[in-house]
Structures are given as C-alpha cells and as structure tokens.
C-alpha cells in the first residue's frame, strides 16, 4: 500500500498540473471507485461539474482537492490506485475507473485502480479539512506536527513501538516499509515496549522517521511493482536505498548479520538480530 512518500509524490505532481483548473466533466466508469460517496456515482459527477481545483493537500495517506465551491474531492489510493495525467487522446487504461476532463486543453486526470481497494468521494464543505479524515493525526513532515505531544502520547501507550508507528491516530503516513527502516536506523526492535522508552529515545526515533520519509520523497517513493507510479506513470527509486525491508537473509548493511524476517500483523517485519535485539520485557498480550 502506498505510504507517505508515495502519496506525497503524487500530491506534488497533481498540484503542478490541476491547481486552478476548472472541471468540465467527470465520468465514473466503475461505481466501486466512488463507493464512499454515499449519494452515488451520478451525484459525484454532477456536484463536481464546473468547479475549480484550488489546491492539492495531503493528510497521512489521504489526498484531498479543495474546490472553489467549498467542497473537496477526497482520495485514497488503496493497494493499487493511481492518479494519472494523460492527454485526452491517450488510450484508456485497462483499469480506468474515473475520468476528470477540464475546461482547458491540458491533460485529463484519471483514477486507475486494478484492485479497486482505493476510491474517491466528495466531502461537503471539506475544503479546509474533510471531516472524513479529521481523525487522522498529522504526519512527521507536517510543520504543525508536535514532537512533545507525540512523545507524551507514545509513552502513555502500553504497546509495541512498531504498532505505535503504524497507529494513524498517533502519527500518520508511516507504513510497514518506513517503520522498519526507521527502527533499523534507531537500533530498536519493533516489539520494544513504548512505555519503556525515554523521551530522548523517542525523539531520536522520530528524527530517523523524518529522515527516512524525506529521503524517500526525494526518490519518488518506493516501487516494488508496476502498481505504484507517480502522475506521469513513473516508478520511485527508494527501494535501492532500503537497509532492511525486503532483505531477508541478506547481510545487514551496518554489521553484516543476516537480516531477519518475522511475521507481524498479517505481514512481515525485517530487522537485524545484532543491531536490533529483541527486548527482554514484552508487552503483555491483551485479553
């Protein structure tokens, strides 16, 4: 699933190409793509006609396009969603779900989604911040993110540090890949109890999270297959810089110990057994 760097890369591309453009027509080619829009596909298309995109913003892994009407288009890429800018004459993609045509002669915006886990909706009055995503915490790259608030909230939790990093109500945008990479840099195992971490240790980890996310944004994100691309259909390159994620049994880039792969929340965690030893005290299992 796209994480913050991938979604931010898409946001930057959209901001360059759709800001201040007026929507002339919207075609919904698959109703599942707008299933989160309760009023239905026809209403989705109708309410967007003749509106102008004012900006492109992001909260965690969600995008929204504020409109001059005061509403907003909210989007989530899911597992395979793509927002592509294409010339109007370009052939339709096999999994094209929604098409936005603009009043000028510039490229059209297409929502393509093979697995249809992603989707678009209109948030009434949501231009500043859609209510649908208001519960999601700010991300570590957000200028208004509070380090002190995060440290205090994290240390009150009785959970494992990796679970906390993936909790979108604590901080947003961090997924499995970048959590593993930040924990490796911080020399912390993902099962380390949060209530045992000192404030300075949490701040050091937060610094590594920011570094990993920032570096990944510069590389256009991480692409493991053809499903993640930017608005021009290009893949990201951060996978070449990964230190542990996806490198099971390969030598740790820091100490040479083979990287360990472990099951975690129906996915996999990657860590170095030497640099990131398991904690002696585990978080008690919930009853």
Curated annotation (Swiss-Prot):
<keyword id="KW-0511">Multifunctional enzyme</keyword>
<feature type="active site" description="Proton donor; for beta-elimination activity">
    <location>
        <position position="61"/>
    </location>
</feature>
<dbReference type="InterPro" id="IPR015886">
    <property type="entry name" value="DNA_glyclase/AP_lyase_DNA-bd"/>
</dbReference>
<comment type="function">
    <text>Involved in base excision repair of DNA damaged by oxidation or by mutagenic agents. Acts as a DNA glycosylase that recognizes and removes damaged bases. Has a preference for oxidized purines, such as 7,8-dihydro-8-oxoguanine (8-oxoG). Has AP (apurinic/apyrimidinic) lyase activity and introduces nicks in the DNA strand. Cleaves the DNA backbone by beta-delta elimination to generate a single-strand break at the site of the removed base with both 3'- and 5'-phosphates.</text>
</comment>
<dbReference type="InterPro" id="IPR020629">
    <property type="entry name" value="Formamido-pyr_DNA_Glyclase"/>
</dbReference>
<protein>
    <recommendedName>
        <fullName>Formamidopyrimidine-DNA glycosylase</fullName>
        <ecNumber>3.2.2.23</ecNumber>
        <ecNumber>4.2.99.18</ecNumber>
    </recommendedName>
</protein>
<feature type="active site" description="Proton donor">
    <location>
        <position position="3"/>
    </location>
</feature>
<feature type="binding site">
    <location>
        <position position="95"/>
    </location>
    <ligand>
        <name>DNA</name>
    </ligand>
</feature>
<dbReference type="GO" id="GO:0034039">
    <property type="term" value="F:8-oxo-7,8-dihydroguanine DNA N-glycosylase activity"/>
</dbReference>
<keyword id="KW-0234">DNA repair</keyword>
<keyword id="KW-0326">Glycosidase</keyword>
<dbReference type="GO" id="GO:0008270">
    <property type="term" value="F:zinc ion binding"/>
</dbReference>
<dbReference type="InterPro" id="IPR010663">
    <property type="entry name" value="Znf_FPG/IleRS"/>
</dbReference>
<comment type="subunit">
    <text>Monomer.</text>
</comment>
<dbReference type="Pfam" id="PF01149">
    <property type="entry name" value="Fapy_DNA_glyco"/>
</dbReference>
<dbReference type="GO" id="GO:0003684">
    <property type="term" value="F:damaged DNA binding"/>
</dbReference>
<dbReference type="GO" id="GO:0140078">
    <property type="term" value="F:class I DNA-(apurinic or apyrimidinic site) endonuclease activity"/>
</dbReference>
<dbReference type="Pfam" id="PF06827">
    <property type="entry name" value="zf-FPG_IleRS"/>
</dbReference>
<dbReference type="Pfam" id="PF06831">
    <property type="entry name" value="H2TH"/>
</dbReference>
<dbReference type="InterPro" id="IPR035937">
    <property type="entry name" value="MutM-like_N-ter"/>
</dbReference>
<keyword id="KW-0862">Zinc</keyword>
<dbReference type="InterPro" id="IPR012319">
    <property type="entry name" value="FPG_cat"/>
</dbReference>
<keyword id="KW-0456">Lyase</keyword>
<keyword id="KW-0479">Metal-binding</keyword>
<feature type="zinc finger region" description="FPG-type">
    <location>
        <begin position="243"/>
        <end position="277"/>
    </location>
</feature>
<dbReference type="InterPro" id="IPR000214">
    <property type="entry name" value="Znf_DNA_glyclase/AP_lyase"/>
</dbReference>
<dbReference type="InterPro" id="IPR010979">
    <property type="entry name" value="Ribosomal_uS13-like_H2TH"/>
</dbReference>
<feature type="active site" description="Schiff-base intermediate with DNA">
    <location>
        <position position="2"/>
    </location>
</feature>
<keyword id="KW-0227">DNA damage</keyword>
<feature type="active site" description="Proton donor; for delta-elimination activity">
    <location>
        <position position="267"/>
    </location>
</feature>
<comment type="similarity">
    <text>Belongs to the FPG family.</text>
</comment>
<keyword id="KW-0378">Hydrolase</keyword>
<keyword id="KW-0863">Zinc-finger</keyword>
<feature type="binding site">
    <location>
        <position position="115"/>
    </location>
    <ligand>
        <name>DNA</name>
    </ligand>
</feature>
<keyword id="KW-0238">DNA-binding</keyword>
<dbReference type="GO" id="GO:0006284">
    <property type="term" value="P:base-excision repair"/>
</dbReference>
<feature type="binding site">
    <location>
        <position position="157"/>
    </location>
    <ligand>
        <name>DNA</name>
    </ligand>
</feature>
């Amino acid at each position: 699933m796209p994480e913050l760097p991938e979604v931010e890369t898409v946001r930057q591309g959209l901001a360059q190409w759709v800001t201040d453009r007026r929507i002339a027509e919207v075609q919904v080619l698959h109703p599942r793509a707008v299933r989160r829009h309760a009023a239905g596909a026809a209403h989705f298309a109708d309410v967007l006609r003749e509106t102008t995109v004012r900006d492109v913003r992001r909260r965690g892994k969600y995008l929204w396009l504020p409109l001059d009407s005061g509403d907003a288009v909210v989007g989530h890429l899911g597992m395979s969603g793509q927002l592509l800018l294409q010339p109007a004459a370009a052939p339709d993609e096999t999994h094209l779900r929604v098409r936005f045509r603009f009043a000028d002669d510039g490229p059209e915006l297409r929502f393509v989604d093979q697995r249809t886990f992603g989707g678009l909706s209109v948030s009434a009055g949501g231009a500043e911040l859609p209510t649908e995503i208001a519960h999601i915490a700010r991300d570590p790259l957000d200028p208004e993110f509070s380090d002190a608030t995060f440290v205090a909230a994290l240390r009150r939790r009785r959970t494992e540090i990796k679970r906390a990093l993936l909790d979108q109500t604590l901080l947003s945008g961090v997924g499995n890949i970048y959590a593993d990479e930040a924990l490796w840099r911080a020399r912390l195992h993902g099962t380390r109890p949060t209530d045992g971490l000192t404030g300075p240790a949490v701040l050091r980890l937060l610094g590594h999270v920011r570094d990993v996310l920032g570096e990944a944004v510069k590389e256009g994100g991480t692409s493991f297959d053809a499903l993640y691309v930017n608005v021009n259909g290009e893949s990201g390159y951060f996978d070449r810089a990964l230190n542990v994620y996806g490198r099971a049994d390969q030598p740790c880039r820091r100490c040479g110990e083979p990287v360990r792969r472990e099951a975690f929340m129906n996915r996999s965690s990657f860590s170095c057994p030497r640099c990131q030893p398991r904690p002696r005290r585990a978080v008690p299992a919930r009853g």
